[in-house]
Design a protein with these regions (language model features):
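Structural recognition of the beta-strand scaffold that forms the well-ordered cores
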Residues: 88-92, 187-191, 216-219, 256-257, ...
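Active-site scaffold of zinc-dependent metalloenzymes
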Residues: 199-242
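Membrane-interface motif at the C-terminal end of an N-terminal transmembrane signal
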Residues: 18-34
Length: 284
């Protein structure tokens, strides 16, 4: 066999082998990115998803309230503030077809934020982040919207970034400022019962925010049956004092909205990234 044929053939075989190894052992959930949302892997059939009657992906965006959403201690409008000081307000946001896991009323959000502030106090020695409280618990507003998870994640490479879930969430909050007290002095951490659609095979989004922005987002859910997950130690956990990967993501996104890392930092290159470059253990 001629060497000019053999060398390209060997290179091609090596490339294919590396791709197979990567998909088999490192990127385990590739198959779930190409399967349609309505494909049931157990029965290997396509199922028709019946949306709640309150869902309206084609109409105007509206805040809705299902009968089952009405629970003791749940609030749908921001509670009165004890001061006008700048603070961060928590929101539990659900698409119309999302399961309510009660993160707002079973204190999972409260204990997650408490874990973040305990860690932050220890690392900074004397600082905490000022969150919005009501009766000594994190003041969390429950919001359900008349859009399905598919509406939030309807995005592909030929569309611009305005179509991603994060921008839709940001627009939703900014256009409903009337349900919040002292809106101008608040930033928001959104616990969204959904996910951000992948942009590439290597890009998995666990949280989003803008530098010096108004909104930070943590994705509390994932596409069904994925093996690898941003939420493997999600806020739905028994160890209420854990500062795990979820808490790290939440704090990371909140700090971005507060202007961290500073642009004058010697270990940042804002032309390439909003993250520090000299320490892998740095929260930023």
């Amino acid at each position: 066999m001629h060497k000019y044929f053999l060398i390209p053939a060997i290179i091609f075989f090596i490339i294919i082998s590396l791709i197979v190894i990567y998909l088999q052992f490192f990127y385990l959930d590739w198959k779930w990115d190409v399967l349609p949302d309505n494909f049931d892997v157990k029965t290997e059939t396509y199922t028709k998803k019946n949306l709640n009657k309150s869902c309206d992906d084609n109409g105007n965006i509206k805040l809705i309230k299902l009968d089952e959403d009405i629970r003791d201690n749940r609030v749908f409008i921001d509670s009165n503030d004890v001061s006008n000081d700048p603070s961060i307000h928590a929101i539990y946001l659900l698409p119309c077809d999302a399961k309510d896991r009660n993160f707002d009323i079973n204190n999972d959000i409260h204990f997650t934020i408490q874990s973040i502030n305990n860690w932050f106090l220890e690392k900074t020695k004397n600082q905490i982040i000022n969150f919005d409280y009501n009766d000594n618990f994190i003041d969390t507003t429950f919001i359900r919207v008349n859009k399905s998870i598919n509406w939030f994640t309807k995005f592909n490479s030929i569309e611009d970034n305005k179509k991603d879930a994060a921008t839709k969430i940001e627009d939703l909050i900014l256009s409903n400022k009337n349900i919040f007290k002292n809106f101008e002095n608040k930033k928001f951490i959104i616990f969204f019962e959904g996910w951000e659609k992948r942009r590439s095979i290597t890009d998995k989004v666990c949280g989003r925010s803008r530098y010096n922005g108004k909104i930070a987002i943590f994705y509390t859910n994932e596409k069904d049956k994925k093996i690898k997950s941003c939420t493997k130690d999600n806020i739905d956990k028994s160890n209420k004092k854990l500062f795990g990967e979820s808490e790290q993501t939440i704090l990371h996104e909140i700090l971005h909205t507060l202007g961290t890392p500073p642009k004058c930092g010697k270990n940042v290159n804002f032309a390439e990234s909003l993250h520090v470059s000299d320490n892998n253990d740095d929260i930023m």
